Amino acid sequence: MDINKVLKERQKWFEWKNIKPIYEKIVQWQIENKQLNVKNVKLNDIIEITLDENKEKLKEIEQIAKMLKPWRKGPFKINDLFIDTEWRSFIKWNIIKPHINLENKDVLDVGCNNGYYMFRMLEMNPKSITGFDPSALFNLQFEFINNFIKSDIEYKLLGVEHIPFYDKKFDTIFCLGVLYHRPDPITMLKELKAGLNPGGEVILDTLIIEGDEEIALCPVRYQKMKNVYFIPTLKALYNWIEKAKFKDVKFIGKRYTDLEEQRKTDWIEGESLNNFLNEDLTKTVEGYPPPLRVYLKLKN
């Protein structure tokens, strides 16, 4: 597979009629605002950016942020503008953070969305950070935020299937909330492994169901999503990982997704978690167990 050819083809995505106006606005805004006066950046649970700019500039920033909806991962704050994203992504990050060391490592985040987790990684002083996500909109959200942070993070319009063909290997690969969207989870785990340096690790977050059997749920829809293929028990997931030939697995934790972590805000369109569960939040609208996520560290 020719990755450069793939990337060149995907640049055409910015010409899509729903993306082109936003893309052109972002490009023009970046050209006109190369010298934005960024006073401070705090890479905390809320990524806070403080600017010393006039009201007109700040109003334009707010308009662009609203053009970029829906905002899934975050939150972000730019002066008084609070981008209250659907997910409070720091909840997941704070589960993972005590179990990782990214100092001087080459890091990949697969399914990186708008880059929230990559921005949080910066405080750990990695050697490099690369993000893969085949979404033009999320890429533009990243470019918007990175215009203030000015990191060296590389964002590629690629997916997990491109990892074995990419011209770089990584010490740590983050794969958060992707596995259940793939029709062949064992192949995907092998693709992640193919992207690791010797001794490298994958930080994996995925949906599971409770139970002692080595089985997986295969729903037509799950939380109204058509693109959920398999949700295994933990034992079945460990079997997948063994079949993908990882040497070791460390259990980090598990957590039910709740309305503290994911909810409807003014920064998304449509529905959120409360619309995907029944009234007492004990099952999905389809009658399946509610979303339970497990966090694992896989060693190459």
Curated annotation (Swiss-Prot):
SUPFAM superfamilies: S-adenosyl-L-methionine-dependent methyltransferases. Pfam families: Methyltransf_9. Homotetramer. This is tRNA U34 carboxymethyltransferase. Carboxy-S-adenosyl-L-methionine binds at residues 73, 87, 92, 111, 133-135, 160-161, 180, 293. The gene is cmoB. Keywords: Transferase, tRNA processing. It comes from the Bacteria.
